């Protein structure tokens, strides 16, 4: 981390609803919620992360430093922290609001999708994560549902959400960070070894794998066997799903999904790989195969995530704000930072009367042998 950062002293508000009109609950976690809201002064739509202060007891000092660092993050592919309020028993983090929806939805809706499209997506993720790493920030939970489109425009950029405040968690609780999405976690995290920025590079490799075939590289109904696969870095480029994918793409993934974190590519090295920086990413249309597998393996009925990007798209289309210009305060949304809970609104949440089904962990996909194409 950078050295101790001054500030920012959050603003005091007697009632946050005097400033913001709460519209909808976008996500819920153990001690927090993400709310879609409108600034009553500017009519700007934002995402407000409401954090129960009791969840931060004993961590106030580190919290101030972490939020100060978040406040300084300015990158075109990372959601921004605009403001902070304290009111009653909660902190309110005012975040940008993304309006473009989820990564998988966009891919499925496209009629044409290529390796080059996937390469452009991964380039944006690598560039943003390199920026975080240069600041000493490790995301630790990169996954497709944390990649959201900035706007409804066809050429919209991708945005990384849901990062940074994980640093406020007990650094010894490595497994608690991974349990919600085991398929994306680096081997050293599962082995409960000290880990570094390299864990993010592994996760980017997993995301690249999924973007090129539509299913995750690791699967087993039994968590222990799933973890064993990850610990050994056992994955395949299965036929026929990878037959039309370039050797360069596979080489890129192998360098990121390298078991040894010391040998694993850094973001800087990955950005220099020919599949990203060169012209080796193919232009062949792989939409049918990839979209079919995404629909099978990441179906909405099975995948209930903590952040509801669909609700944002619905609101944006209703208000005809989905294509706001970047320079005019177009907003992007921050996903859920804390581990989701089951069974109702978040404990200690700021809107207990809101009826929202909390997110649950991403289910594993069927093994390659049972993924016969229709």
Curated annotation (Swiss-Prot):
Widely expressed. The modification Phosphothreonine is found at residue 177. Transmembrane segments: none annotated. This is Calcium/calmodulin-dependent protein kinase type 1. Phosphorylated by CaMKK1 and CaMKK2 on Thr-177. Polybiquitinated by the E3 ubiquitin-protein ligase complex SCF(FBXL12), leading to proteasomal degradation. There is a cross-link at residue 59 (Glycyl lysine isopeptide (Lys-Gly) (interchain with G-Cter in ubiquitin)). It comes from Rattus norvegicus (Rat). Calcium/calmodulin-dependent protein kinase that operates in the calcium-triggered CaMKK-CaMK1 signaling cascade and, upon calcium influx, regulates transcription activators activity, cell cycle, hormone production, cell differentiation, actin filament organization and neurite outgrowth. Recognizes the substrate consensus sequence [MVLIF]-x-R-x(2)-[ST]-x(3)-[MVLIF]. Regulates axonal extension and growth cone motility in hippocampal and cerebellar nerve cells. A motif (Involved in nuclear import) lies at residues 263-264. Its EC number is 2.7.11.17. Monomer. Interacts with XPO1. Residues 20-276 form the Protein kinase domain. A motif (Nuclear export signal) lies at residues 315-321. It is found in: Cytoplasm; Nucleus. Keywords: Allosteric enzyme, ATP-binding, Calmodulin-binding, Cell cycle, Cytoplasm, Developmental protein, Differentiation, Isopeptide bond, Kinase, Neurogenesis, Nucleotide-binding, Nucleus, Phosphoprotein, Serine/threonine-protein kinase, Transferase, Ubl conjugation. The gene is Camk1. The autoinhibitory domain overlaps with the calmodulin binding region and interacts in the inactive folded state with the catalytic domain as a pseudosubstrate. Activated by Ca(2+)/calmodulin. Binding of calmodulin results in conformational change that relieves intrasteric autoinhibition and allows phosphorylation of Thr-177 within the activation loop by CaMKK1 or CaMKK2. Phosphorylation of Thr-177 results in several fold increase in total activity. Unlike CaMK4, is unable to exhibit autonomous activity after Ca(2+)/calmodulin activation.
């Amino acid at each position: 981390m950078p050295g101790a950062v001054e500030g920012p002293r959050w603003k005091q508000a007697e009632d946050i609803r005097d400033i913001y009109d709460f519209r909808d609950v976008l996500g819920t976690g153990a001690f927090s919620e993400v709310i879609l809201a409108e600034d009553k002064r500017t009519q700007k739509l934002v995402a407000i992360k409401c954090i129960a202060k009791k969840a931060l007891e004993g961590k106030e000092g580190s919290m101030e430093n972490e939020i100060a660092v978040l406040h300084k993050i300015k990158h075109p592919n990372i959601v921004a922290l605009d403001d902070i309020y304290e009111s009653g028993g909660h902190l309110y983090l005012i975040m940008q609001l993304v309006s473009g929806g989820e990564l998988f939805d966009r891919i499925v809706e496209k009629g044409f999708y290529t390796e080059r499209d996937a390469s452009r997506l991964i380039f944006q993720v690598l560039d943003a994560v390199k920026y975080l790493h240069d600041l000493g920030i490790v995301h630790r939970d990169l996954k497709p549902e944390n990649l959201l489109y900035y706007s409804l425009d066809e050429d919209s950029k991708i945005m990384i959400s849901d990062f940074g405040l994980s640093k406020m968690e007990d650094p010894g609780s490595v497994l608690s960070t991974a349990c919600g999405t085991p398929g994306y976690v680096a081997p050293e995290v599962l082995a409960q070894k000290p880990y570094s920025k390299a864990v993010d590079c592994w996760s980017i490799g997993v995301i690249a794998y999924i973007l090129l075939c539509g299913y995750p590289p690791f699967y087993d109904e039994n968590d222990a066997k799933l973890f064993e696969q990850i610990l050994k870095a056992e994955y395949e480029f299965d036929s026929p799903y990878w037959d039309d994918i370039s050797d360069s793409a596979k080489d890129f993934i192998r360098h990121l999904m390298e078991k040894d974190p010391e040998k694993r590519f850094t973001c800087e090295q990955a950005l220099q790989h020919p599949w990203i920086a060169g012209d080796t990413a193919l232009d062949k249309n792989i939409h049918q195969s990839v979209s079919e597998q995404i629909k099978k393996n990441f179906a909405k009925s099975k995948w209930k995530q903590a952040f509801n990007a669909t609700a944002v798209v619905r609101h944006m289309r209703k208000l005809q704000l989905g294509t706001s210009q970047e320079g005019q305060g177009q907003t992007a949304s921050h996903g859920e930072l804390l581990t989701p809970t089951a069974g109702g609104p978040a404990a200690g949440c700021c809107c207990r009367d809101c009826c929202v089904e909390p997110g649950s962990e991403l289910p594993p996909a069927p093994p390659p042998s049972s993924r016969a194409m229709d």
